[in-house]
Amino acid sequence: MLKRTKGLLLLTLLVITGLAGTLKDSIISQKERKSAISLMKDTKADVIKSVKGLSDAQINFKQAPDRWSVKECVYHIAIAEKNLWDLLEGSMKASANPEKRSEIKLTDEQLIKIMEDRSNKVKTVSSFEPQNTPYKSLHEALNDFKERRTDHIKYLKSTTEDLRNHVVQMPFGSIDCYQLSLMIASHSNRHTQQLNEVKASPDFPKQ
């Protein structure tokens, strides 16, 4: 009887240890967490810095009728922050699909590089177009972006969710939800670059 009890206890300990290992393995590493948070913080600061002190004439200036103004770039950054994070949250509420990890072709570094490469032109979907956003001013859009990004950083600091085993299908291929958080941050970098290109135009108002 004692042998049997010891055997059951050992089996229980093995199961618990095994489960603990599984849970630990499914949580993003400290290195991954730090990388995502740093990217989120840095790109947030860049957006804020890029529009600081600009006049109405400057934020509304367009290099051409079919090009975005500084204000429109911020509208796009803000709505993308919301919509892409909504996608992440929806994916995390669904069942994990680790079997789809084999469909992921991009490393974290490759994804960031592609997103931040402005030579790779991509037409945005209609719901992300500045004129289709709910914002009425740059101030409103910027505040919405800042509040959401702050919440997203808090989430990444504390989450124990299995981001790597929730895979989502994007127009360019499959990525996991950790990569989606990197995509959100690098997307804002991409359009901060665009915004700075507008500011660098020879015709950009002096004030």
Predicted regions and their residues:
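Short, helix-capping/interhelical loops that line the mouth of catalytic, cofactor-
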Residues: 16-35, 86-143, 175, 202-207
